[in-house]
């Protein structure tokens, strides 16, 4: 199997705020960075201070001082379903448009190896691009050669990309954003020139090959892929593109309100709105994309959307948009000493918010930001990679962002149950490592990786833990949890001593078959107690609880390795082993990192597959800070610390695992390494990295090439082609998800039901603050100043017992209800304080004898950001290149 080396692998709305005066100033944010007066919000009868979110976010706006001349460098906007990269090539402001459900589905008669089969290359289900919108005239208004000034800004608080350009030839002022109701993209455009010129607003669609395996194999003869079924159209007020794909169709419609124009169809792929020559064009473009799965008449539906937007008018839509985003940002915050990482946190959260409200979760590679026609690396849903962007969203108090992912995975259940029978001849459900949007799974090459289903089930369980949404648990989470647990019940074998074993599986993506793989054991130890608790909550399956408990209590223990030496001959302490090899084999450098080491059947393994030995820590949470002082905790720490820097990869999780174990400095070291290697795109996107340290999978220059094998007549040949690597430059979501998750875990942990504040801060981080959500639907606001934790504010969204590890170990805790001022009884056991909460109430938690004051609010470090930021050689934004 080849992959990734294998793997080249809260809460009233704030008052509506006026628009920024230009792309490079924020009129509502003081330039000196002085904080605006703190406001108050009310939630469930709770009044509490609130920071100036606008000022906090303005610090982190992404600023371009030069035009983005490549789509991949564009600023991301969207309505949560339809998105665009806004970029500024010399010919004019351009929007590369995508949508969450533009699926070109594969035929039903797919083979078991459809994911990697050469015969199936360019036939597999693909999320294709939407269209390109360009506003152009006959002058090079945005050519750097003629620019006097240029500023573009991603205004995070307002969720707008703003452009302001000046040259001797004229000026461009534009603002683009996504409007969730009625579901349109909006471009506000004002262009002036020194002489009368005609302008064209062009809408085009040119499909292409997908190049899922760009690094390994491709079909040079498939150049007609994506070109068929496209038709451009126009009426006096609209232009559009329609395309019929293999199973669905879609339409993209644009309407312009402003300067007079006429429409024309240039060819089957392009339609335009053309103005008469004038020295100024002013107006708004409204654009909608609709598929036949949303409406049987997508063209008419898309037309209705843009007409509704035009009828409401720009100012009304923008006011509504601003209110929605003010409310969005009021849900959470964090502030840490590393401003650059904090900036990436907010940018990553924004990017997910503008793309993860659609029918499907955005694919991890490219997301809804593919810049080059339909080309997309790793075009399927890969379970581990697809989870990572969603790891942080519940703690960030945005569980709504996980809805598309949760829905997709729960709707896959029937297919996973079928594949459990077909592939493994077992009951329950087996989720494969790789699937398409219909849940059709890879049934060869990855069949011995048994953990995806249970890890997916635990994603759903985590969503319940943070939201306490009983209906979600009943309808979506528990059925998947139960079915995946049943698969393991059928798969496990019991030995003569009554101990249950996993007889044969692989650890994550390893090709090595093992017994008692640590990934399976970790998944079972997490999921079986979760199934028991879920069945108790729902009042079902009492008889199954007995079975789950019996297996859990008699499951084989994790195995360890060492002390000794690893495959590379390096001395190591006692660490976790991935399992016991079931075969004799000799390692290779490509797969195992070292050449020629002989492994014998029955030998314990270590360091063989994607740091799988850390699975007991994360994502399973079987070992964490609650286990401090135990042998297994110490082994976990040594295992994490033994991870080589080369393994600090964008798609792995040692940073999160380090934070879970309280290793704040190590977590920071890893996330710094990952950011340096993988955050190469100027708008703050991460890309894949490569096996070579400090070498992201991103074209170093225009002549960098990939050399895949050529496929002819459905067969892979020994011939190799040279494809420009820049064709495949695109963002990858895992790095941002991992960064967010790591920072969340450094500031707040609650995965085991106990709230721990600042559990993994680096030694140098004396000051930090946050408002994040904890398991049990508690919203926690905390500030640490000069190394001292201030009183905490805990809001109970659903009621229940709050369990909190005392952040002042030498002092006793007092809890006071904020609204009434009454004291609340507190019970303490082994350093864990417990008190009962009421839904909608907020509580101050503070040491007895200290003032009962709310935690200090974060203050902006400076005013609105005016320039690109640099850090350790990385940059957010774009410097001036003229």
Regions found by a protein language model. Name each.
Residues 180-189, 776-803:
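Carbohydrate-binding surface patches
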Residues 29-72, 77-379, 399, 409-418, ...:
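Acidic/polar, glycine-enriched structural segments that form the non-catalytic walls/loops
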Residues 197-205, 795-809:
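Surface-exposed beta-strand/loop patches in extracellular or lumenal glycoproteins
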Residues 483, 487-537:
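Acidic/histidine-rich catalytic neighborhood
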Residues 136, 730-780:
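Catalytic cores of secreted or luminal carbohydrate-active enzymes
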Residues 5-27:
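N-terminal export signals
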Residues 805-821:
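Solvent-exposed beta-hairpin/edge-strand motifs
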Residues 382-415, 438-439, 445, 449-470, ...:
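Active-site core of glycosidic bond-cleaving carbohydrate-active enzymes
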């Amino acid at each position: 199997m080849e992959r990734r080396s294998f793997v080249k692998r809260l809460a009233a709305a704030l008052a509506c705020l006026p628009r920024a005066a230009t792309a490079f100033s924020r009129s509502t944010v003081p330039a000196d960075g002085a904080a605006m007066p703190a406001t108050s919000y009310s939630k469930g009868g709770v009044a509490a201070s609130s920071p100036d979110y606008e000022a906090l976010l303005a610090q982190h706006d992404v600023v371009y001082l030069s035009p983005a001349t490549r789509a991949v460098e564009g600023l991301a906007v969207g309505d949560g379903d339809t998105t665009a990269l806004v970029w500024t090539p010399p010919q004019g402001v351009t929007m590369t448009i995508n949508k969450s459900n533009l699926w070109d589905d594969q035929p039903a008669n797919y083979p078991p190896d459809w994911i990697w089969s050469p015969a199936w290359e360019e036939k597999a289900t693909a999320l294709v691009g939407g269209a390109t919108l360009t506003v152009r005239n006959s002058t090079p208004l945005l050519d750097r050669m003629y620019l006097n000034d240029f500023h573009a800004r991603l205004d995070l608080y307002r969720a707008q990309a703003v452009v302001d350009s000046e040259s001797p030839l004229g000026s461009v002022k534009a603002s683009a954003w996504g409007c969730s109701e009625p579901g349109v993209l909006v471009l506000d455009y004002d262009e002036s020139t020194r002489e009368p010129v005609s302008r064209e607003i062009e809408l085009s669609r040119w499909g292409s090959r997908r190049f899922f395996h760009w690094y390994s194999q491709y079909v040079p003869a498939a150049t007609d892929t994506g070109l068929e079924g496209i038709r451009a159209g126009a009426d006096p007020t609209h232009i559009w593109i329609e395309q019929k794909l293999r199973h669905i169709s879609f339409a993209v419609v644009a309407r312009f309100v402003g300067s007079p124009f006429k429409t024309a169809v240039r060819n089957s792929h392009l339609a335009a709105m053309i103005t008469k020559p004038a020295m100024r064009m002013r107006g708004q473009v409204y654009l909608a994309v609709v598929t036949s799965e949303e409406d049987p008449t997508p063209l008419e539906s898309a037309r209705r959307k843009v007409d509704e937007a035009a009828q409401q008018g720009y100012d009304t839509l923008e006011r509504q948009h601003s209110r929605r985003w003010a409310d969005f940002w009021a849900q959470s915050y964090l502030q840490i000493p590393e401003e650059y990482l904090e900036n990436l946190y907010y940018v990553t959260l924004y990017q997910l918010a503008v793309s993860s409200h659609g029918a499907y979760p955005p694919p991890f590679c490219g997301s809804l930001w593919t810049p080059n026609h339909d080309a997309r690396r790793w075009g399927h849903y890969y379970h581990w990679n697809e989870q990572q962007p969603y790891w942080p969203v519940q703690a960030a108090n945005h569980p709504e962002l996980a809805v598309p992912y949760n829905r997709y995975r729960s709707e896959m259940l029937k297919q996973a149950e079928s594949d459990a029978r077909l592939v493994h001849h077992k009951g329950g459900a087996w989720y494969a490592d790789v699937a398409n949007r219909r849940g059709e799974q890879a049934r060869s090459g990855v069949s011995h990786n048994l953990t995806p289903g249970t890890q997916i089930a635990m994603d759903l369980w985590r969503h319940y833990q943070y939201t306490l949404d009983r209906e979600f648990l009943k309808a979506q989470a528990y059925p998947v949890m139960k079915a995946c647990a049943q698969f393991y019940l059928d798969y496990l074998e019991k030995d003569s001593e009554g101990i249950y074993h996993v007889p044969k599986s692989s650890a994550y993506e390893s090709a090595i078959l093992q017994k008692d793989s640590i990934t399976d054991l970790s998944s079972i130890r997490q999921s079986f107690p979760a199934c028991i608790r879920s069945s108790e909550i729902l009042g079902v399956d009492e008889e199954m609880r007995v079975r789950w408990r019996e297996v859990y209590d008699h499951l084989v223990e994790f195995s360890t390795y060492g002390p000794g030496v690893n495959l590379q001959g390096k001395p190591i302490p006692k660490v976790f082993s991935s399992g016991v090899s079931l075969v004799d084999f000799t390692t290779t450098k490509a797969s195992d990192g070292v050449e020629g080491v002989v492994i014998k059947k029955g030998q314990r393994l270590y360091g063989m597959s994607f740091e799988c030995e850390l699975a007991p820590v994360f994502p399973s949470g079987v070992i964490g800070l609650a286990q401090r002082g135990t042998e297994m905790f110490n082994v976990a720490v040594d295992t994490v610390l033994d991870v080589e820097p080369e393994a600090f990869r964008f798609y792995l999780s040692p940073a999160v695992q380090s934070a879970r174990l309280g290793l704040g400095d190590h977590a920071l070291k890893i996330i710094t390494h990952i950011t340096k290697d993988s955050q190469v795109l100027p708008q703050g996107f991460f890309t894949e990295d490569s096996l070579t340290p400090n070498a992201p999978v991103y074209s170093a220059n225009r002549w960098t090439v990939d050399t895949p094998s050529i496929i002819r007549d459905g067969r892979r040949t020994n011939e190799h082609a040279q494809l420009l690597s820049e064709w495949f430059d695109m963002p990858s979501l895992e790095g941002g998800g991992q960064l967010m998750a790591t920072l969340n875990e450094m500031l707040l942990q609650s995965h085991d039901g106990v709230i721990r504040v600042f559990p993994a801060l680096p030694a140098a981080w004396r000051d930090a603050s946050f408002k994040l959500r904890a398991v049990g639907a508690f919203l926690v606001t905390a500030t640490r100043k000069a190394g001292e934790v201030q009183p905490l504010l805990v809001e109970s969204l659903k009621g229940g017992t709050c369990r909190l590890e005392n952040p002042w170990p030498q002092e006793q805790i007092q809890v006071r209800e904020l609204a009434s001022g009454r004291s609340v009884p507190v019970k303490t056991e082994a350093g864990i304080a417990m008190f009962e909460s009421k839904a909608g109430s907020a509580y101050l938690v503070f040491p007895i004898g200290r003032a009962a004051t709310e935690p200090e609010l974060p203050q902006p470090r400076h005013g609105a950001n005016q320039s690109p930021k640099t850090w350790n050689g990385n940059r957010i934004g774009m410097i001036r290149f003229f």
